[in-house]
Amino acid sequence: MDTKNLPFLEKVMAKSGVHDIFDARDLTEVVFRVMRDLMTTEAADRVEAELHKPAETTEDRSLQLEIADLWHDTNPIVAFLSRVRPPWQGPGIFKIDSDRFLFRVENEGPMPPTVERETLVKAVFSATKDELSPDRIAEIATWLPDHIHQLWQEA
């Protein structure tokens, strides 16, 4: 299915098997949150700067967001903490490896039981890569752990 001309959230739905646009929005935000947790604030800001495009074309005000709003996080506390903490990399209990990345995606959002975690992550990655420059795509890849990096490359 060619999704190139679909709005961002509809791309996520089409490629992931998520049937509810609100779930697609919420799950995208979770994937973005975990991605941001791996990155420096400066790197996350460079990504956000390229995502100032509508997430969905709709009359529903709850969906009238830019993709950057989802990247930044609509939860003000989470958005603030993302800006003041260092990347969750390296040794320690907060390190985000591939398993923890997928665990968080599955457990921090409304993950439908019929959707595979990897399929959802690849769908969000694919829709996101459609919006980013080659420089941002390459930069994000440098922050991702092994299996998640592979999903990013495949998306």
Residue locations for each model-derived region?
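General marker for long, soluble alpha-helical cores
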Residues: 1-155
